[in-house]
Amino acid sequence: MSPYRLALVFVLAAATTGCDFAARTGIVRDDMLVLTDAQKVIADTKINHGDMTIRASVDRADTTYGAGQPMVLSVSTSKNAHVAILRVLPNGSTTLLFPDKAHPKADIAANKTLTIPEPRDGFAVTADKPGVVLFEFVASTAGDAWLFKRAPDKDSDFADLGVTSRAIAKDIVDSLKVGKTGADTAATYVTVRVR
């Protein structure tokens, strides 16, 4: 084997190892590559303003679930806030998961973890079809946005917001009045893979 080919083999091996390491450690999130355009619109919404932070997670470190399998979501904020949790499916179908029928108030105390669903809630958060599901977590120190007041649909635990993610993203930002008031706003998201 010529020295050039040997060098090329080493470079390709190093690049492959580096990409695998980055994906495994979260430096590069491989799930970002599979978000649909409708999901990216929500994930890329510019909501963060002020110094409040938000943390979110699901109950599985590998974030992989079977179709129809229940998921447990957790969120906490660094300040007293109002929180909303959205589920965005690959086709853009968006559901407001929190506030919900069991928790009509969107309030969360600073540095306390909110878990949805809680064991006594009587409902489950699931995804029925394989693909990547985006969970967007939004918080504000002001509670006047429709996102924190929206009631669930009749005979449902949640509110269906439709499939127009671009319109929903714009409406969320407008309703939160990001940067136009003294309120802190923060958002983060978690993606899960449904197999």
What do the PLM-derived regions correspond to, one by one?
Residues C19-R195:
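Secretory-pathway glycoprotein ectodomains that are cysteine- and/or Ser/Thr/Pro-rich
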Residues F10-A13:
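Short, linear, compositionally biased motifs with a strong N-terminal bias
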Residues M1-L8:
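Bacterial N-terminal signal peptides that target proteins for export
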